[in-house]
């Protein structure tokens, strides 16, 4: 079995299909892992969700911030970003079943035989694998509940839960988990999440900020970590066991596919017409 990991698709469905054709992806024997943000800026968000849903066991997905935002937009809790191309998805006849499928997806995935963990934005340095499992599973349970919109989604738009500590309420822990696993980029020197700076690490001039993956972490010392989210990084991280797969396809750059077994990365430039 070949394991392929793809960066943020964001509705760039044609580029995804070109990549998969390039490597002769066969869902009967291969697996496709996606780092989240399946939807948003590209024109093929509907096709992307339908594709991963029909992959069933041959596809492994984690939720990204744009995927969670879609849940809020579909429920009219938030308005769609005018730069997103979600119209065909939001008006599709199967939008209800697609939303239900999406909210059943987790915030992390594991490949134990390779000591590999995948999330959308990364893993907080102070979290062990056990903490990641426990906190992310609590969020997943909330998303799968019938009242997920009122109990979780309508509360998640806050920057307040930016520092992990033992005295957090249950809801604060869930919001911190969402913020860390789907929005994290830079951390302050005391470990607080920073939500303002989205620059490439080399362009950040604030001495108190550094990328989360440059902090000494409990997981990145023992596991291979796969993440997306931060297109400005363009795949450049100072570790051979951390793979940054968002290479900005929806921003005019390219989509990246990583083949685990050969440790090769294959790219597809964004198509001009999309």
Curated annotation (Swiss-Prot):
InterPro entries: ApaH, Calcineurin-like_PHP_ApaH, Metallo-depent_PP-like
Reactions catalysed: P(1),P(4)-bis(5'-adenosyl) tetraphosphate + H2O = 2 ADP + 2 H(+)
Keywords carried by this UniProt record: Hydrolase
One function term, GO molecular function aspect: bis(5'-nucleosyl)-tetraphosphatase (symmetrical) activity
Pfam families for this protein: Metallophos (PF00149)
EC numbers on record: 3.6.1.41
Top-rank taxon: Bacteria
Family to which this protein belongs: Belongs to the Ap4A hydrolase family.
Role of this protein: Hydrolyzes diadenosine 5',5'''-P1,P4-tetraphosphate to yield ADP.
The protein's name in its UniProt record: Bis(5'-nucleosyl)-tetraphosphatase, symmetrical
Native species: Shewanella sediminis (strain HAW-EB3)
């Amino acid at each position: 079995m070949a394991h392929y990991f793809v960066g943020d698709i964001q509705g760039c469905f044609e580029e995804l299909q070109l990549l998969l054709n390039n490597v002769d992806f066969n869902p009967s024997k291969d697996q496709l892992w996606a780092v989240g943000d399946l939807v948003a800026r590209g024109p093929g968000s509907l096709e992307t969700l339908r594709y991963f849903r029909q992959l069933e066991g041959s596809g492994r997905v984690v939720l990204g911030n744009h995927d969670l935002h879609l849940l809020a937009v579909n429920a009219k809790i938030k308005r769609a970003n005018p730069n997103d191309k979600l119209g065909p998805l939001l008006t599709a006849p199967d939008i209800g079943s697609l939303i239900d499928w999406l909210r059943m997806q987790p915030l992390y995935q594991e490949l134990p035989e390779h000591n590999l963990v995948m999330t959308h934005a990364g893993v907080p340095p102070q979290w062990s694998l056990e903490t990641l499992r426990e906190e992310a599973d609590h969020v997943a349970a909330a998303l799968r509940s019938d009242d997920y919109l009122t109990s979780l989604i309508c509360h998640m738009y806050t920057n307040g839960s930016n520092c992990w500590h033992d005295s957090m309420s249950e809801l604060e822990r869930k919001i911190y988990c969402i913020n860390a696993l789907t929005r994290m980029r830079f951390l302050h020197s005391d470990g607080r999440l920073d939500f303002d700076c989205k620059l490439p690490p080399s362009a950040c001039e604030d001495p108190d900020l550094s990328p989360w993956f440059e902090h000494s972490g409990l997981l990145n010392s023992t596991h291979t970590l796969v993440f997306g989210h931060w297109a400005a990084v363009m795949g450049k991280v100072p570790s051979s066991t951390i793979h940054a797969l968002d290479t900005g396809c929806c921003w005019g750059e390219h989509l990246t596919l990583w083949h685990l077994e050969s440790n090769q990365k294959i790219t597809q430039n964004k198509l001009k017409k999309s």
